[in-house]
């Protein structure tokens, strides 16, 4: 659920402000606050507003004592509204109104689905009731080249953005000298935010906004020449440079559907992003069914953004060998297996936060109990039995040696895609349990809550061990990972140095 902060600058709007306020109060989505900023109106705007919001705690009326104009009013209202970086700011002029009572509901769905930074959209003009001329999606080549300031103006009402994006704008870029721009305020903050958002700026085609053409105080009517001069000045401001890394989670073959393989690519993109202050984007979370199934668990906190290839550079990883990814300005697309902790180990805590691990662990413990004194054992059979040319089938000697390492009286929790076979092979253990009938993400997280881990030659249990945050954990991993077809592949970059491979 998103929390919206609706900012409404207004001046002498007595003929329309009731329609504006009512359109907010009638929203079907109620998780919002509204800040109305009256810029010393000389008509009855304030009195009308006070009568409408007197019993509604979600509304705040800010009454200026000096003339500040719209952009400064928006800036100060946002500063006044709190400091949660995930709040969604919505700008609505006091002489305009929401075109539908489901506007916030639709916005909430868009932000949840796309994990975007900002939205722009479509509006209907009043009183003609015609679609506005700027209701268009920004062209792909403009987004890719970040040439917003050199292009036609597209990003129109309804404009919304995450607060963390707003906080990255330099105040000087909202000003002409010492004063905030008095006109064309939308361009002043939209250009920087579009440049910083790239594919994370989403166009909404549905009509959410009613733009009032009747107001004689509209900028283009009051001083069209000053409006054009201000627009030129804003376009000449310095461009905001932002790097992006776009992950092709499905890998070189296009079928890395397993969660273990996915996580290597995701973590690598996150590691690159943290290393170079880039913005990571994962559009396949929305479009691919094998990735989408984890959108509410591991990928809950990740950016999705627009579809399409917006990359200006491409990095293809060599199979199973660590190769540092060169920093690239602009948008970099990465594709590969990336099966090495070296891509992201330096940012471990941030990776854990990004993958929602702490919340997931708490949920698993609450659902299945506390296994913090157990040793997890993962046995990979199933598909490996038919692909032994590529994947080595671990023998029971490996598991017996691992059990001896911990002692047979230890508590063991066994995970496998062939539990029936495991129940026969491990039936001599005194304290053993088997994980059954769980989702893949649940098994990985449950492994990570165990005290120690015995993994298979599988990215699935590799992640169960890596996500284990027990500082004194022991992880036992096989020294042989591949079958004869891949005998030339090394795992030197795959297994962390403190894991044991010689049992």
Model-predicted regions and their roles:
Residues 1-242:
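Nucleotide-sugar donor-binding/catalytic module of glycosyltransferases
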Residues 49-52, 290-301, 422-429, 487-492:
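Short, aromatic/basic amphipathic alpha-helical patches
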Residues 67, 95-97, 124-126, 166, ...:
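Short, solvent-exposed loop/turn segments at secondary-structure junctions
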Residues 253-264:
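A short, glycine/small-residue-rich beta-strand->loop->alpha-helix junction that serves as a flexible
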Residues 259, 406-490:
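Donor-binding and catalytic core of enzymes assembling or modifying cell-surface/extracellular glycoconjugates
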Residues 264-273:
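Histidine-anchored nucleotide/phosphate-binding helix
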Residues 285-408:
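Secretory-pathway luminal glycosyltransferase catalytic domains
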Residues 483-503:
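Leloir-type glycosyltransferase catalytic cores
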């Amino acid at each position: 659920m998103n929390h919206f902060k609706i900012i409404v600058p207004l001046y002498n709007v007595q003929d329309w402000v009731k329609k504006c306020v009512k359109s907010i109060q009638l929203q079907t989505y109620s998780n919002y606050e509204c800040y109305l900023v009256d810029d010393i109106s000389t008509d009855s705007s304030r009195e009308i507003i006070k009568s409408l919001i007197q019993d509604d705690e979600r509304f705040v009326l800010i009454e200026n004592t000096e003339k500040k104009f719209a952009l400064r009013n928006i800036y100060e209202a946002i500063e006044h509204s709190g400091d949660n970086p995930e709040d969604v700011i919505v700008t609505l002029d006091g002489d305009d109104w929401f075109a539908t009572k489901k506007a916030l509901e639709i916005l909430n769905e868009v932000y949840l689905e796309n994990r975007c930074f900002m939205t722009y959209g479509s509006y209907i003009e009043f009183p003609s009731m015609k679609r506005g001329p700027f209701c268009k999606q920004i062209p792909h080549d403009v987004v890719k080249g970040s040439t917003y300031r050199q292009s036609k103006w597209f990003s129109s009402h309804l404009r919304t953005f995450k607060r963390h994006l707003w906080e990255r704008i330099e105040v000087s870029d909202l000003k002409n000298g010492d004063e905030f721009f008095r006109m064309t305020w939308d361009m002043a903050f939209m250009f920087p935010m579009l440049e910083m958002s790239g594919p994370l700026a989403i166009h909404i085609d549905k009509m959410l906004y009613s733009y009032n053409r009747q107001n004689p105080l509209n900028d283009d009517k009051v001083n069209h020449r000053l409006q054009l001069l201000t627009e030129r000045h804003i376009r000449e401001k310095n461009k905001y440079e932002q790097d992006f890394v776009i992950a092709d989670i499905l890998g070189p073959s296009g079928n890395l559907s397993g969660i273990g393989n996915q996580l290597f690519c995701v973590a690598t993109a996150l590691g690159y992003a943290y290393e170079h202050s880039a913005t990571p984007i994962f559009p396949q979370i929305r479009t691919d069914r094998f990735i989408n199934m984890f959108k509410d668990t591991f990928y809950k906190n990740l950016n999705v953004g627009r579809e399409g290839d917006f990359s200006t550079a491409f990095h293809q990883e060599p199979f199973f060998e660590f190769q540092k990814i060169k920093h690239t300005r602009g948008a970099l697309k990465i594709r590969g297996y990336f099966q090495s902790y070296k891509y992201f180990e330096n940012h471990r805590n941030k990776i854990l936060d990004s993958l929602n691990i702490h919340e997931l662990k708490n949920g698993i413990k609450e659902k299945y109990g506390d296994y913090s004194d157990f040793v997890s054992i993962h046995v990979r059979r199933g598909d490996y039995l038919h692909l032994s040319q590529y994947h080595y089938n671990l023998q029971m000697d490996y598991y017996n040696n691992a059990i001896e390492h911990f002692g047979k009286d230890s508590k063991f929790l066994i995970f496998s895609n062939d539990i029936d076979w495991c129940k026969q092979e491990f039936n001599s253990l005194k304290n053993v349990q088997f994980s059954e009938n769980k989702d893949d993400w649940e098994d990985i997280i449950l492994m990570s809550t165990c005290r120690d881990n015995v993994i298979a030659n599988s990215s699935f249990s590799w992640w169960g061990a890596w996500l284990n945050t027990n500082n004194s954990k022991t992880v036992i991993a096989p020294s042989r990972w591949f079958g004869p077809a891949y005998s030339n592949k090394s795992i030197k970059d795959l297994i962390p140095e403190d894991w044991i491979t010689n049992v």
